[in-house]
Swiss-Prot record:
GO terms for molecular function: bis(5'-nucleosyl)-tetraphosphatase (symmetrical) activity. Hydrolyzes diadenosine 5',5'''-P1,P4-tetraphosphate to yield ADP. The keyword Hydrolase applies. NCBIfam families: apaH, PRK00166.1. InterPro entries: ApaH, Calcineurin-like_PHP_ApaH, Metallo-depent_PP-like. SUPFAM superfamilies: Metallo-dependent phosphatases (SSF56300). This is Bis(5'-nucleosyl)-tetraphosphatase, symmetrical. Keywords: Hydrolase. It catalyses: P(1),P(4)-bis(5'-adenosyl) tetraphosphate + H2O = 2 ADP + 2 H(+). It comes from Methylococcus capsulatus (strain ATCC 33009 / NCIMB 11132 / Bath). Gene3D superfamilies: 3.60.21.10. The gene is apaH. It is an enzyme of class 3 (hydrolase). Belongs to the Ap4A hydrolase family.
Length: 278
């Protein structure tokens, strides 16, 4: 049995199938872990969702910000943006089944010594705390009507964790930290304006995994979301978003002692022009 973590697919279904051929994926004995953002911006969101859902227990995924955006559009809270490419999902005959499956995916997934999350774990939390906080959001998403949550999840505040946070502010921080975070200041305050590669940000900001006095996560964090960072192997974290959508690669990491990396190039040189507005 082999376990592979795979970076942001974002509807790049053809590349996903090529990657699975490369690693010789066998759903009868292997397992896939996806870092979220299964949909949007790429050409085949519907095929991607159907395929991954159809893998059953052979696959697990966490929710990414694009997945949440799809849910918000589907329930009428948000509008389709000009770069969105998930109209095929919204018009599909099995739309309701796919969306019901998607909204019951976790924000954090633990697999042995690995912790899978879309954007990262904020500096004030370890993996166990992240699982508990994620559970608060997951309970709301699984409860039925998610209109209220989708309406309230947008916004950049609060940007600093406190155990005293309550209500929508608390849920918004949890969601933002786990699905949108890249940079923090040295106190752990989240910054959502800077989206480029490390080295281009203001001196007051550092990647979330480099914040001084960051709480040890107690697990190896596997994340995506940050395509301008690309493949990154830190002391206790790995970034697997290698920008397939923008003409880069789709990456898989074998979660064993070797941590062998596999990648396939984007087809057609990418599906959209690179942007820092992901």
């Amino acid at each position: 049995m082999a376990i592979y973590a795979i970076g942001d697919v974002q509807g790049c279904y053809a590349e996903l199938r090529r990657l699975l051929e490369l690693i010789r994926f066998d759903p009868a004995k292997d397992r896939l872990l996806f870092t979220g953002d299964l949909v949007n911006r790429g050409p085949q969101s519907l095929e991607t969702l159907r395929f991954i859902r159809g893998l059953g227990p052979a696959a697990a995924t966490v929710l990414g910000n694009h997945d949440l955006h799809l849910l918000a559009v589907a329930c009428g809270v948000s509008r389709v943006k000009h770069k969105d490419t998930f109209g095929d999902v919204l018009e599909a005959a099995d739309r309701d089944e796919l969306l019901a499956w998607l909204r019951t995916r976790p924000l954090v997934h633990r697999e042995g010594s690995y912790c899978l999350v879309h954007a990262g774990i904020p500096p004030a939390w370890n993996a166990e705390t992240a699982m508990a906080r994620a559970g608060e959001v997951e309970t709301v998403l699984a409860a039925g009507d998610i209109t209220g949550f989708c309406r309230q999840m947008y916004g950049d505040k609060p940007d600093l964790w406190s155990d005293d946070l309550a209500g929508w502010d608390r849920l918004r921080f949890i969601t933002n930290a786990l699905t949108r975070m890249r940079y923090c200041d040295r106190t752990g305050r989240l910054d959502f304006r800077q989206k480029g590669a490390p080295g281009r940000q203001p001196a007051s900001l550092v990647p979330w995994f480099d914040v001084p006095d960051r709480v040890p996560p107690g697990a190896t964090i596997v994340f995506g979301h940050w395509s301008t960072l690309g493949y990154f192997a830190g002391k206790d974290c790995y970034c697997l978003d290698t920008g397939c959508l923008w003409g880069g690669e789709l990456t898989a990491l074998k979660l064993d002692g070797t941590l062998e990396r596999y990648a396939v190039p984007s087809l057609h040189g990418g599906y959209q022009k690179p942007t820092l507005a992901k």
